[in-house]
Design a protein with these regions (language model features):
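The feature captures the conserved acid-bearing segment of alpha/beta-hydrolase catalytic domains
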Residues: 55-65, 81
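Histidine-centered active-site/metal-ligand motif
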Residues: 72, 83, 104
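Catalytic active-site module of serine/aspartate enzymes centered on a nucleophile-bearing elbow/loop
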Residues: 93-124
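Conserved catalytic core of Hanks-type protein kinase domains
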Residues: 90
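Alpha/beta-hydrolase
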Residues: 1-59
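Conserved alpha/beta-hydrolase "acid-adjacent" motif
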Residues: 77-83
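Short beta-strand/loop motif that positions the catalytic acidic residue
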Residues: 64, 69-72, 76
Length: 124
């Protein structure tokens, strides 16, 4: 898995053209390396991830008191827009930041600084 460009691992997935462009940027390489490593170990994480849509989580998100910022791209084909909206409405101290022009990966690449600054601001 380390012998090739990790962005090849996402080719053919449900990613937009913007995501494929974002996946080639150097700032995204370490995240893709992590994804490639995770995928090389099996797909249990996928089943766990998708099962969270089908069964109770074991806690009530409304009980979470720490502040959060939820970032979502308007062109995201992987995470429904309703998911970010629902989370922001059910986490008492959350705010939703939507970037209509961004995709699933693109938001992290193109708003990297803003995302980190918003996380740091929550710690103050």
């Amino acid at each position: 898995w380390q012998e090739h460009d990790p962005s090849e691992n996402i080719a053919g997935t449900n990613l937009s053209e913007n995501d494929l462009i974002a996946s080639k940027k150097p700032t995204w390489k370490s995240a893709l390396d992590s994804c490639a490593f995770t995928m090389s170990k099996g797909w249990d994480w996928v089943a766990d991830d998708y099962s969270s849509y089908l069964k109770p989580w074991g806690f009530d998100p409304r009980d979470i008191k720490v502040p959060a910022v939820i970032w979502q791209g308007g062109l995201d084909k992987n995470v429904p827009k309703q998911h970010g909206k629902w989370l922001s409405e059910n986490l008492p101290n959350a705010r939703l930041e939507v970037r209509p022009e961004e995709s699933h990966l693109g938001i992290f690449v193109n708003y990297e600084v803003e995302i980190m600054e918003s996380a740091i601001a929550l710690l103050k």
